[in-house]
Amino acid sequence: LVAPARPRAILVGPGKRFLSGISYYTYGLGRALASERNLSVLLIRRLVPARLYPGGGRVGQQLSSISLPDDVPTYDGLDYFWGPSAIRTLLFLHRQQPDVLVLQWWTGTVLHSYLLLSFVARRLGAKVIVEFHESLDPGEQNHRFLAAYVRLVSPRLFRRCAAFVVHSDSDRELVRSGYNIDPALVKVIPHAVYDHHAVTGARAPRPDGICNLLFFGLIRPVKGLDDLIGAMDLMDDVEAGQYRLTIVGETWENCEPIVQMARESRHADRITIVNRYVSDEEADGYFLNTDLVVLPYRKSSQSGVLHLAMGYGLPVVATNVGGLAEAAADYEGGELVEPNSPSALLDGIRRARDLPAGTFSYGHRWTDTAKAYWALIDSLSGASENVDDDDDDSSPLLGRTA
């Protein structure tokens, strides 16, 4: 007897031109999946017009050395306006003949392209999986036109899906309530720890017992940086002298006043601000010089920064929102606090300040993610077709839309 051929998969996600946390995830997942089986990767190259992107000034800069194995067929990539890139994308799909198409979802800007890809992939006989990083980008949720567009059009995509992947039970409920997706079709695969940063030096010792705090990542309203600054301001001069706070991140959604708040803090002399998107090498330096990472988020499905901090074995103070509690549940260096409270944040910092940096580990690795993904893909390859070809909103995958 001849064993049946293993299913072939194409992974679709953002490339490095519009570098983001989802870019790092796509490359990490791509490397992990390719280490187990044959995989192809299709990258989204131009996400939106650069002038409309909050970080448009750095679009196309070489800020990261992340890469895929040379033997992984890759097309980089598909542009938002399609044009010749769409033709080359369709040819790539036809050459690869996938059994499964895995789409990374975090923003409505990819919806029209994902509709095209899912339509063509299914005509080639492939099943479609959507992996949610957010139900929708927080900024887009607050944009009436974009939110309405996604609400009206996304059922056409999700009806075509054989399965969905999220990173936590919290996210499963989020996509159920947000898109009326049957929870039975949603597989929880925890976010793997980030290990793409090559550690290039030794961890710096604490000078004079100073605890170095790090806020890292995009500065947005949902990130709660103002609560962290408020926590610093609650310290008296003696206590503040025991800390240094470094803020590293690009400003989005008109959050310049929050950066100004840090500059005008009563302890501004204890705060360093690096107000831009930094390279991998710079990020490595900041994490190696950090004793405690603080995530004062007001809302979060998951956090790439959390998994990056855990990759460095650093203590983390995080708010108990979204899937953060589940992600940090088995991490001994995690300290959870209530959101929207500078005083609770300060208490968490005080409790965690003496935890030994660089000594903790997180159990879920990329190899675990790859095994879970391929098991899901294998289960779909033997399943009967259970998705609709038409655009009827009463599809069995999705309940009737409101």
What are these regions (language model features)?
Residues 119-123, 146-164:
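Membrane-proximal helix-turn-helix segments that form the acceptor-binding/catalytic region
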Residues 330-331, 335-342, 349-354:
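Conserved acidic donor-binding segment of nucleotide-sugar-dependent glycosyltransferases
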Residues 315-320:
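Short hydrophobic beta-strand element within catalytic cores of glycosyltransferases
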Residues 170, 192:
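Carbohydrate-associated surface elements
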Residues 258-277, 281:
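Nucleotide-activated donor-binding/catalytic signature segment of Leloir-type glycosyltransferases, i.e.
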Residues 13-19, 30-95, 250-254:
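N-terminal strand-loop element at the rim of the active site
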Residues 162, 285-301, 314:
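Acidic donor-binding loop of glycosyltransferase active sites
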Residues 205-223, 229-232, 246:
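Conserved donor-binding/catalytic core segment of Leloir-type glycosyltransferases
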